[in-house]
A protein has these predicted regions:
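Residue-level signature for tetratricopeptide repeat
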Residues: 2-3, 37, 69-71, 114-115, ...
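Structural motif corresponding to the intra-repeat A-B loop/turn of tetratricopeptide repeats
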Residues: 6-7, 41, 75, 118, ...
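Short coil turns that delineate tetratricopeptide repeat
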Residues: 25, 59, 93, 136, ...
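"A position-specific structural signal for the A-helix of alpha-solenoid helical repeats
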Residues: 33, 67, 108-110, 117, ...
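Acidic, Ser/Thr-rich low-complexity linear motifs
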Residues: 94-102, 137-153, 194, 291
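Acidic, serine/threonine- and proline-enriched intrinsically disordered linkers and terminal tails
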Residues: 182-234
Length: 385
């Protein structure tokens, strides 16, 4: 089944797994494998259901609980994910406070991204900021270990430790949190937070109850409202942008976000640096040209990439709101390289924006991602295309 999944034969992989489950329905590894196959196909709801079945075979298994929580967060089911992680955190400490104390980036980053997809900017910004603080703590705490390591004379481990500290900002969780925080800052700049309106449309987190013997510091701003009011300006992102420009030059999404942040701030120099990294380090000259507002010559574009076609379609819509982007995105579909599911979703949104025909496009994408229709429904449930 794993080999079939690697070859993108989703139906064949699921058939093998169903046969195995019929033989041994109590083997949770089969459910985990099925969840991964479904996730790769875009069927995130069915993937979460498979993880639920695996987790319920042994509720005391922490790995299964964390995997189930992450699958729920992919679907935007934040409240249910909170309930799942409560199985193994301390009973006398609120779940979110405990996860923050544990520096659980694996939960906080996807949870923040789920809030972002919902449009809940304050809570998303709060969690992204928590993760950024974790990495600051990692760097600051290193100084407690220098003397200890030298006293123990474990110089090989010390050498590895120094290299690990140098690379801490290259971590994928840091990049995702940094990009998410910048997006939140841009959203707050475009539409400043109306606290009264937010309180009317969202249920605020109640204050925690201190049980006897429980020692923890209250989070006085669990919903991020005070944080947005105090540190919700574009200038707050200066340090984050500096780290991304140093350690994430090869991350295309990070460079696009830095460019958008710098353009909104009016920082021409930073825009040029981000575009140069996209062009020279990420090897995406079309992305750099599009962001800089340069005209992309259609004849010179490699149309075997759906990502390139999306850029052409967006350029056509900019120049002419009634442009036919359907043919740009779908012509000679069979000659294209296999696109990523995120590119497929972005192309779907472009078609919807241009009021194009989306049903045939979804049918084409399902040749690659059997669960794409489900993926679109989940994304559009929270996001406006």
């Amino acid at each position: 089944a794993q080999m079939e999944d690697f070859e993108h034969h989703t139906a064949a992989a699921l058939a093998r797994l169903d046969a195995a489950l019929a033989h041994t329905p109590t083997c949770y590894d089969l459910y985990v494998c099925k969840a991964k196959v479904l996730k790769h196909a875009g069927a995130v709801l069915h993937s979460a259901e498979a993880m639920r079945q695996a987790s319920e075979l042994d509720l005391a298994d922490r790995y299964m609980n964390t995997a189930r929580a992450k699958s729920l967060l992919r679907c935007g089911a934040v409240e249910e994910a909170d309930h799942v992680v409560s199985y193994w955190v301390r009973r006398d400490v609120p779940d979110r406070i405990e996860l923050n104390l544990l520096q659980a980036c694996w939960f906080e980053v996807p949870c923040a991204e789920a809030y972002w997809r919902r449009g809940d900017v304050p809570r998303a910004y709060k969690l992204f900021s928590n993760v950024l603080e974790h990495f600051t703590t990692f760097v600051q705490d290193q100084f407690d270990f220098h003397g200890y390591v030298l006293r123990k004379s474990v110089l090989t481990a010390y050498y590895d430790f120094l290299h690990a500290v140098d690379a801490v900002y290259r971590d994928a969780y840091y990049r995702r949190a940094a990009v998410g925080a910048l997006r939140c800052l841009m959203a707050l700049h475009e539409r400043p937070l109306d606290e009264a309106a937010y309180k009317e449309t969202h249920t605020l987190t109640p204050p925690p109850v201190h049980k006897k013997g429980a020692e923890f510091v209250d989070d006085k701003d669990p919903d991020g409202l005070a944080l947005c009011a105090k540190r919700g300006s574009l200038d707050t992102g200066n340090d984050v942008v500096m780290e991304l420009m140093l350690y994430a030059k090869d991350d295309a999404e990070a460079m696009r976000t830095v460019f958008a942040w710098a353009a909104m701030k009016g920082d021409t120099k930073r825009c040029e640096e981000a575009a140069a990294n996209l062009r020279d380090v990420c090897h995406l000259p079309l992305d750099a040209a599009y962001l800089e507002g340069k005209h992309i010559d259609e004849q010179s574009v490699d149309r075997s990439s759906l990502h390139n076609r999306i850029l052409l379609a967006r350029q056509a819509l900019k120049e002419n709101a009634g442009a036919d982007v359907q043919s740009v995105l779908t012509a000679k579909w069979e000659e294209m390289e296999r696109p990523t599911i995120d590119d497929c979703y972005e192309a779907y949104c472009v078609l919807k924006e241009a009021k194009g025909e989306t049903e045939s496009f979804v049918a084409r994408v399902k040749e690659h991602y059997l669960g794409f229709e489900e993926y679109v429904k989940v994304r559009c449930l929270w996001c406006v295309c």
